């Protein structure tokens, strides 16, 4: 299932603005509510649909990340990616996205289908915890992120990771996902 517009709007939980309702937007909204209301994240530390921009052979692309959580110093510490399939099959993509994220790398990532989740150590690789309870509370997130500060990528590392990320994301470009397309002038 790809994300498509439903032709209506809804009020965004995080910003209060009217946004396009899509096949995934209700999941994104539920994840934002869970983070704020159940896990104690300050609402102003979450940003929805934040882009990772990159180039492949000179052609620009961008891919939105569902929710990015920023620490009090405005550094990305957690990327949350919704998946419409097996959580395990999205783990590598989410880890790579966290390492490539602007202002990062973000040390942690969560991939979830809203019934299951995996908390990932983006820099070290691997799954730290599974299940919806794996999503840390705010204070716990800050502690975990401080323990896992990732070094900035070298240009060679970034180039390699961009190709991996594009391979995972590339099937979306030109498909029905309006938010995930090559950026053209």
Language-model region placement:
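A short glycine-rich, hydrophobically flanked beta-strand micro-motif that places a catalytic Asp/Glu
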Residues: 110
């Amino acid at each position: 299932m790809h994300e498509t517009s439903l032709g209506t709007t809804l009020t965004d939980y995080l910003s209060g603005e009217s946004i396009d309702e899509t096949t995934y937007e209700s999941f994104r909204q539920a994840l934002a509510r869970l983070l704020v209301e159940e896990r104690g994240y300050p609402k102003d530390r979450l940003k929805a649909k934040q882009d990772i921009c990159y180039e492949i052979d000179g052609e620009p692309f961008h891919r939105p990340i569902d929710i990015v959580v920023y620490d009090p110093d405005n550094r990305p510490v957690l990327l949350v990616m919704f998946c419409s399939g097996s959580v395990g099959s999205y783990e590598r993509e989410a880890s790579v996205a966290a390492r490539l994220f602007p202002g990062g790398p973000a040390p942690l990532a969560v991939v979830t289908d809203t019934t299951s989740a995996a908390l990932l150590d983006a820099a070290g690789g691997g799954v730290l915890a599974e299940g919806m309870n794996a999503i840390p509370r705010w204070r716990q997130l800050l502690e975990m992120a401080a323990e896992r500060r990732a070094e900035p990528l070298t240009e060679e590392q970034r180039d390699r990771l961009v190709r991996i990320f594009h391979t995972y994301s590339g099937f979306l470009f030109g498909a029905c996902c309006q938010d995930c397309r090559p950026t053209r002038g």
